[in-house]
UniProtKB/Swiss-Prot annotation:
GO cellular component assignments: HslUV protease complex
InterPro entries assigned: AAA+_ATPase, ATP-dep_Clp_protease_ClpX, ATPase_AAA_core, Clp_ATPase_C, HslU, P-loop_NTPase
The protein, known as: ATP-dependent protease ATPase subunit HslU
A Pfam family matched in the record: ClpB_D2-small
Source organism of this protein record: Sinorhizobium medicae (strain WSM419)
Amino acid sequence: MSSFSPREIVSELDRYIIGQKDAKRAVAIALRNRWRRQQLSDELRDEVMPKNILMIGPTGVGKTEISRRLAKLAGAPFVKVEATKFTEVGYVGRDVEQIVRDLVEVGISLVREKRRAEVKAKAHQNAEERVLDALVGTTASPATRDSFRKKLRANELDDKEIEVDVAETGNPGGAFEIPGMPGANIGVLNLSEMFGKALGGRTRKIKTTVKDSYALLVNDESDKLLDNEQIQREAVASAENDGIVFLDEIDKIATREGGIGAGVSREGVQRDLLPLVEGTTVATKYGPVKTDHILFIASGAFHVAKPSDLLPELQGRLPIRVELRALTKEDFRRILTETEASLIRQYKALLETEGVTLDFTEDAIDALAEVAVQLNSNVENIGARRLQTVMERVLDDVSFNAPDRGGQGVTIDADYVRVHVGDLAANTDLSRYIL
């Protein structure tokens, strides 16, 4: 779990997301509170519950991006799910408990990577011995092995082809679920693991070069040095105490008054989410997982439905409300120029691979922002995603002819932008279909 201060978290998010100060502060405080809780005494720690967050705002303003960046910062198990993918128990589809199972799987991957890094030196040493075994055999004299070891470390044998045994990864029987019994693949997986251990584990022979064999063998040797049961225990504890679940599109399962359609299933999903958000125990193949201290961040555009259309019980379990505002022309301008991997920087880098130097004037950036705002207000407000559409239209000709213009420079100014999208943006009816 990272120990960044709220100010540091907001500063890091500022590198990728423009504006939305309230949302950044809310997630920064929530993340810091996870760390604060870990510092408490055992009896008080169990009493401190996370304050779940509901982010409300139009599409394309940064709700999902904030969650993605937060996940990288947190260094904790994190899953992002769309609420619309789940159905009420009894309906065909995934049930909400799968969220927790996915969270534990993410936790296992994180803990395994961390433990692998700790034993990497020893694993590399063991991998080197296995490469030498493949090159000179296990019965070779120490002098021969030392001679080949020197060549190996001097990269003289990198291209030599060898045959090595590596552990079989994945379940050969394949995982499956019995309809109506989520998690029913648990028994199947455990049986295959038990038989695998009883038979000493499955291996397969592969032919590869000495250079390429190292990555496979180091992973293989790392896994031999790790205690799987310990990893599973740590992953479950990490998911329970540090886990973050981002529930996107929650407005799509809100039931509107007087609405018709799949209302029962929508309301059913909300009712299934209640115990998960409040705190329950979910059975996974790694053991029971308590959801009491998992942080839930829900988000939705709420164009049609309102937050008050959610079940009152679910509203009560999302106590922190944050509203994200629509983007202005100045925001679009900053998105194009100030973010860490801005669109302008991306397009410049892409065209540089063809030897084309791309340059944008200040008035071109203003024109791009203006067109994006105009289209969002006249057609449909899709937020910052509109910039991608506009940029693609503007640079269509340059991108297509780039291979023939190697070594040339292209300057995009306001007139160039207006020629390529200005007329189209002005014609609202045409814009609806093209932009």
